[in-house]
Amino acid sequence: MQDVTTEPAGPILRLRGIGRRFGGLDAVRDVDLDVAHGERRAILGPNGAGKTTLFNVISGDMPQTSGTIEFLGQDIGAISAPGRTRLGMGRTYQKSRLFLGLSVEDNLYLAVLGSRGGHQRLTRRAIDGEMRDRARELARAVGLERQIGTLVGSISHGEQRQLEVAMARATEPKLMLLDEPASGLSRGERLALTDLLLELDKSITLILIEHDMDVALRVAQNVTMMHDGRKIVEGTPDEIRANALVHELYLGGRVTDDGIEVTS
């Protein structure tokens, strides 16, 4: 018998005319975006481009001022961040939300407990075999099985980022949002993180908010470039590398008839 299982029709995430206003300032203006199931998408831009504001609108941490947002074909504009998590969104934040005084394992227990929904408290009695197995599985998936009993404050910044990715996976999300996960990492740590993101289950859609062009272009299949709150360019990594406007606005270059003049 032929397998007739297919992915849901249409994009997993669709934004139309998304705007976010703070007083008289448009932090995000009229953004349209379609992200396909299983796609790795980077939203790239310098500081102040509106990337994190757009992240917060998608995640539900901040309401949009205008426009519509659909996830899996459902309008989620009025759904809270926890509600979006239950629908299948996972996320990591630029500012760490880890408990540095707890072990890697205990942080994972908290993520697993949270994935079960409702108001629950982490106690030793609450930790069952299923939770323990799931925490160790998540640690193993990001290469932290040897650090499972180590206090989070004692592991490297790069390992903390890996732990955040593991915790975001606890809910088995269909879409993962990562806000500048490479921020503050050394070159080696950035490479390790990008390798990890490339090895994620290909059924998980990934949206990477990033100001580091090397990270964005290494991880993403498609890139959306933002500037001054607007989407200005969209394309594959090769198309982004070759785009004169990207060089002029992002790399500090100046477009001339002779090519791109980059200033130091």
Where are these regions (language model features)?
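Glycine-rich phosphate-binding loops of nucleotide-dependent enzymes
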Residues: 2-264
